[in-house]
Structures are given as structure tokens and as C-alpha cells.
Amino acid sequence: MRKLLIASLLLAVCMVAMAQVTMTIDAKKRGPQIGQYHNGLFFEEINHAGDGGLYAELVSNRSFEDGLSNWSAYNGAVIAQTTKNLLNGAQTNALGVDISGASSSNKKGVANSGYWGMNIQKDSTYTLSLWIKGSSTFNGKITAELRSQDGNQTLGTAVLSGTVNTVKWNKLTATIKATASDKKGQLLLLTGINGHLDIDVVSLFPYTWKNRRNGLRPDLAQLLADTRPAFLRFPGGCYVEGEGSYDNAFQWKKTIGPIE
């Protein structure tokens, strides 16, 4: 009891002593000058700060490094990850798609849900590209559709330009103008032709900050630019050393050039 009383008295004394502390501020007196390089930005690829965040790419897992994550078969198509006859040495996986029972009125294919859905805005234009190779039985076109989250509404559609080659990988492209909006939309790649397809590096971009190719989200990038940073630390944090191993650490030299 005596020890408890002493402890209580000491605590009370400390609180009184803290309460007596005062601070005086002279608003007319200028303090130390802050250097022009004191404030800047720090970027670490964590919690989707880049992919799904500042980076404007709408397709999640576009090169299938994460297996079939965010990809699904549509209308009875059969999909599987493949590591054979890849696009190039930089790629480690591709998506194999087997289609049977398809027709012009019964198209089949694959869907990508993006990062928590794709924010599709009416009257906005989206740039689509992908690499593809087909079997000898495939001879047709690929149609891209932007769909609502529930799949019941088409938000935009386009036929990809280019040829599906049976010997080598070819790049197909399309521009899609949205006719309706859905903050959690999805991308569908469809065909009415039966056969086998290998697909890789599927990319869908909205308008980017300063209209730069393969660029940044305009809203987020402009907010950062408006802070007028003196510098950008990139990469920052543990991202620079990789996840568990230096083998997957960020290597900026490998980011130069086409995304594929």
C-alpha cells in the first residue's frame, strides 16, 4: 500500500511539472531557412502504389507472372498457364486458350477483372495491345469488349487489327471508345473461331498524364506534381533489395524499352 501511494505521488508530481511547460512563439522572427532540396517524393512499390495505383495500366497480371490471377475463362473456353514457345527470353509464362463450340453468335474467350475492377468512363478512349499466336486450325479475328462488372452491359467494343499467325507471335492492337461507365468494369477478349491460342502481354491504357505512352494516372500524377517536389527517390524502401532475395530486386536497366 505504501509503495502504491509513493508511486501515485510521483506520478502526480510529474504531471504537474509537465503542465508547467510553456512555449513562446515570436511570429515576427524568422526561423532557420529550409533548404530547397529538403522536400521531395519517395516511391516504394508497396500496397499497389505502382501497379494498380500510379501506373495507369488497367490489366492486372498482364504477362501471367502470377499464374491465372485476375484472369478467367469466358463462356466455356479452357485456359491454362503455359511455359512453352514463349514470346521472347524476357517472358516466363503465357496464357493458353482452347476454344471449341464457338460461332459468330456464341463467342468465347477470356476475361480480366483488373485491379478491383477497371474504372471505365463513358466517352473515354482506351488503347489495347496484346501478343498472340494461334494453332493451324485458327483463322479469324479477336474482338475486345469492355463489360460491366456483372457482365450484362457492353461498355465498348472493337475488333483488333492485325493477323493471328500460326508460326510466330504477332502484335494486335485496338482503340476502344467507351459508350457507358462502370467503376468496376472488365476486359473480354473473344472470338467466334475454334482452335488454340497463346496470349501474352495484354495491355489496356486509358488517357495518361501528359498523354505519355505507357504512362501514369492523370489524377494521381498531377496531385504529386502539384506538391512541386525537389526530388524523387526511386526506388525507395525495401523495394530496392527485392522480396526475400536480391534475385527479384528492382533493376532499372531492364525496364528500358518495350513492355514485352
Where do the protein language model's features map onto the residues?
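Bacterial Sec-dependent N-terminal signal peptides
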Residues: 1-21
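Extracellular and organelle-lumenal recognition/adhesion modules and their flexible linkers in secreted
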Residues: 20-260
